[in-house]
UniProtKB/Swiss-Prot annotation:
Acts as a receptor for colicin S4. It comes from Escherichia coli (strain K12). The lineage of its organism: Bacteria, Pseudomonadati, Pseudomonadota, Gammaproteobacteria, Enterobacterales. Belongs to the OmpW/AlkL family. NCBIfam families: PRK10959.1 (NF008202). InterPro entries: OMP/PagP_b-brl (IPR011250), OMPW (IPR005618). It is found in: Cell outer membrane. One of its GO terms (cellular component) is cell outer membrane. Keywords: Cell outer membrane, Membrane, Signal, Transmembrane, Transmembrane beta strand. The gene is ompW. This is Outer membrane protein W.
Length: 212
């Protein structure tokens, strides 16, 4: 009887392991906090005002993943609009910009399909669209107006890990690096200006996921 009990427990463990699997054909969604942190030195120059910096911002991040095989996934990153303040040492904050950075990734999941712990890496492409950008009163007092930023295409890389709590739920930690370079168009003292802007942010996401 004891041997039968041990055997039954072993079979149950094996079955529960496979039930936790990331398997071909599965679809899952994650939601959590996503923080965009421009790299050190990110920013650019604003004519005679000199260099400027860009603040971090945290929003709701969403990822949608389809497992093409037990080890290959395709993921789309989405989020609520990120909001960054732009400032210079001389003037403080002078502008606010908003953007959305949808990113499509091809992923490789390490380990066995039945593992509860699935680290992965990914590579793909990022598209960033900028909107609702403008100078605040400090910027206008400095003679700045008519701010717009050009949309950007760039490469993206990713590392992350899923931990499967049960058949339906998981928790995730992931990090992206995105190549985001744009051009800022604006007026300074009524004269049209065009300056290059580099963001190249790290994106950190902590989330919970549900598998369908």
């Amino acid at each position: 009887m004891k041997k039968l009990t041990v055997a039954a427990l072993a079979v149950t463990t094996l079955l529960s392991g496979s039930a936790f699997a990331h398997e071909a054909g599965e679809f899952f969604m994650r939601a959590g906090s996503a923080t965009v942190r421009p790299t050190e030195g990110a920013g650019g120059t604003l004519g005679s005002l000199g260099g400027f910096s860009v603040t971090n911002n945290t929003q709701l991040g969403l990822t949608f993943t389809y497992m093409a095989t037990d080890n290959i996934g395709v993921e789309l990153l989405a989020a609520t609009p990120f909001r960054h303040k732009i400032g210079t040492r001389a003037t403080g904050d002078i502008a606010t910009v908003h953007h959305l950075p949808p990113t499509l990734m091809a992923q490789w999941y390490f380990g066995d399909a039945s593992s509860k712990f699935r680290p992965y890496v990914g590579a793909g492409i990022n598209y960033t669209t900028f909107f609702d950008n403008g100078f605040n009163d400090h910027g206008k007092e400095a003679g700045l107006s008519d701010l717009s930023l050009k949309d950007s295409w760039g490469a993206a890389g990713q590392v992350g890990v899923d931990y499967l709590i049960n058949r339906d739920w998981l928790v995730n930690m992931s990090v992206w690096y995105m190549d985001i370079d744009t051009t800022a168009n604006y007026k300074l003292g009524g004269a049209q200006q065009h300056d290059s802007v580099r963001l190249d942010p790290w994106v950190f996401m902590f989330s919970a996921g549900y598998r369908f």
